[in-house]
Amino acid sequence: MEHLYYGIWDNVAKCYAWVGESKNNATFARMCNVMEKDEKTFIGQSPQDYIGYQLAAFNDETGEFCNHKEKVWEGKPNE
């Protein structure tokens, strides 16, 4: 089974604020969109500072780990 790993890059701190697993790009983007609308979350406080990337895929049957960085979400400023 393939596991996909994602990261939320903080443009101000110049590091990943969060790294974790998600089912696919759409479910990761949905999570980011929900947090972007909630000002109680770190993303919601300043969404324009964050970009979401798919970072890697891991196959738990073969042990293959593939690094690749693909932008799948970008925060937009609060209106």
Language-model features, listed with the residues they occupy:
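Eukaryotic short linear interaction motifs
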Residues: 15-16, 29, 61
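Short, mixed-charge low-complexity intrinsically disordered segments
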Residues: 37-79
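Short aromatic-glycine-(Arg/Gly/Cys) micro-motifs in beta-strand/loop hairpins
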Residues: 1-15
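Short amphipathic alpha-helical surface micro-motifs
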Residues: 1-3, 31-37, 53
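A short, charged, amphipathic alpha-helix used as a generic interaction element across diverse proteins
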Residues: 24-44
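A short, exposed loop/beta-hairpin motif centered on an aromatic-Gly-Thr core
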Residues: 15-23
